[in-house]
């Protein structure tokens, strides 16, 4: 089965909403994303120097990597995902899908 990741950069809508953004992302949004079949895990990262976007890495383990991402778009289109009012939309988050081409270790 193909393996890959979905990589997404996001920022809070404003510095004063950052705590709400992290709470929503960690307590609600990660569960929404990983509810899609084939998206098996999620991790978030912050820049060490405090500058730049936060990133989320979603692990994909499915036959159709792009199809998993399309399921997310379909869910959003049907209104099945929580509001994105805490996300900065300029520029908008863009999911990037990468397929695994090698690995080392466990």
What are these regions (language model features)?
Residues 1-106:
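Macromolecular interaction modules
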């Amino acid at each position: 089965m193909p393996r890959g990741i979905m990589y997404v950069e996001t920022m809070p809508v404003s510095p004063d909403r950052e705590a709400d953004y992290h709470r929503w992302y960690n307590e609600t949004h990660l569960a929404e994303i990983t509810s899609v079949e084939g998206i098996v895990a999620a991790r978030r990262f912050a820049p060490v120097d405090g500058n730049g976007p936060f990133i989320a890495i979603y692990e994909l383990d499915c036959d159709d990597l792009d199809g998993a991402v399309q399921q997310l778009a379909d869910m959003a289109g049907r209104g099945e995902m929580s509001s994105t009012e805490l996300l900065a939309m300029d520029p908008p988050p863009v999911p990037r899908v990468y397929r695994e081409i090698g690995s080392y270790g466990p």
